[in-house]
Amino acid sequence: MSKKGSYKSVGGDFRYGDESVSRFINAVMLDGKKDVAAKIVYDAFDIIAEKMTGENPLEVYRKAMSNIAPVVEVRSKRVGGATYQIPMEVKSSRRGALAFRWLKLYAAKRGGRSMAEKFAAELMDAANEQGASVKKRDEVHRMADANKAFAHFRF
């Protein structure tokens, strides 16, 4: 019998009906204040709609998420007294979670504006293959590429 619970869908968000946006709102949420998190995310989408006229904010968000999400990462494994950094493919659920985490982290580190403006700026930069969260993804990919020699140690 499987010990792992079944996958629970979070359902769509209020405005777009998109499950990914709903997951992002949940990632932004602090202390169970979902309304505050939703307001921040939707305000960020409104700012994107203002600044990038003719662009759908949901499409900018999706493009940014695909640009931030890592494909490979390194995992530590101990082999014969030595610890190796082994490159491994990232599962799709973890890929999204890492993208949310990095976007939230690097948006918060931006200048002293509102959080919605910070998210909007980071999402627009990520959609254009720029920004700190995309640099983090590139750094993770470089680490995996540098340790390609240890790929045969896979779990």
Swiss-Prot record:
The entry's keywords: Ribonucleoprotein, Ribosomal protein, RNA-binding, rRNA-binding, tRNA-binding
InterPro entries, sorted: Ribosomal_uS7 (IPR000235), Ribosomal_uS7_bac/org-type (IPR005717), Ribosomal_uS7_dom (IPR023798), Ribosomal_uS7_dom_sf (IPR036823)
Any Pfam family: Ribosomal_S7
Domain of life: Bacteria
GO cellular component, one term: small ribosomal subunit
SUPFAM superfamilies for this protein: Ribosomal protein S7
GO molecular function: rRNA binding; structural constituent of ribosome; tRNA binding
Entry keyword annotation includes Magnesium: no
GO BP, sorted A to Z: translation
Keyword Oxidoreductase included in the entry's annotation: no
NCBIfam families attached to this UniProt entry: rpsG_bact
HAMAP family: Ribosomal_uS7_B
Stated family: Belongs to the universal ribosomal protein uS7 family.
Role noted for this protein: One of the primary rRNA binding proteins, it binds directly to 16S rRNA where it nucleates assembly of the head domain of the 30S subunit. Is located at the subunit interface close to the decoding center, probably blocks exit of the E-site tRNA.
Subunit structure comment from the entry: Part of the 30S ribosomal subunit. Contacts proteins S9 and S11.
Protein name: Small ribosomal subunit protein uS7
